[in-house]
Amino acid sequence: MIFGHGIDLQEISAVKKAYDRNPRFAKKVLTPKEWERFESLSGERQMSFLAGRWAGKEAFSKAWGTGIGAVGFKDIEILNNDKGAPVVTQSPFEGNVFISISHSGDFVQASVILEKTKR
């Protein structure tokens, strides 16, 4: 049964401005494993990755029904599987989490569906 669905859209240039003002911003959003991946990238790819993780976590918090605050950025971890697709590997939700992150030009869109599992 679907518990919630959240969508978020981020402008990569706005995320870059926030990062340029305060590079520690990325460490507030990313878990240690996400940070490792971020550090392995460079330039525009770094900002695209950061914006994608931000959008994914915002979308999760909307699906969860709270928004960021009741659930923190570091409570949610989004890594890539062996095919490169994003997967939520850590979250407060007990059930299935489906995530999609899409990049187009200066924008990143994320969609998260939370599905309760039957017990």
Swiss-Prot record:
E.C. number(s) listed in UniProt: 2.7.8.7
Record keywords, A-Z: Cytoplasm, Fatty acid biosynthesis, Fatty acid metabolism, Lipid biosynthesis, Lipid metabolism, Magnesium, Metal-binding, Transferase
Annotated Mg(2+) binding sites: D8, E58
Enzyme class: transferase
Main location: cytoplasm
GO molecular function terms listed in the Swiss-Prot or TrEMBL record: holo-[acyl-carrier-protein] synthase activity; magnesium ion binding
Protein name in UniProt: Holo-[acyl-carrier-protein] synthase
Originating species: Streptococcus thermophilus (strain ATCC BAA-250 / LMG 18311)
